[in-house]
Amino acid sequence: MLCWHHTFPEMNHNELVGWTEKNDSLVVLTFHTSFDYKRTLKRYEVCKPIFQKFSSGVIDITAKGESKLEQFLYLIHIGDWISCYIADLKGIDPVEVNVINHLKSEL
């Protein structure tokens, strides 16, 4: 299963140009904090309909906590649990790293 990340505003310059056809196997997860910059939020508001048009869905996850540290740790924690849950649904060992070990051995 392919997974990648990008950040605003950088994805508006590079990633977004590739969103040209519908991919029903793609789901967009967005992570937000109460500290998000207002221009970044505006960029997201403009991009969300594009994500919806070319993917099977968009899931917004907003951090809990009061400080930046609490919110960042919350998002890291929930992101890890999401990864483990999806791996379990697909019958994949979430800690197996054979391909990485192979790469390291070849280098």
Regions flagged by a language model, labelled:
Residues M1-L107:
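A SIS-like phosphosugar-recognition module
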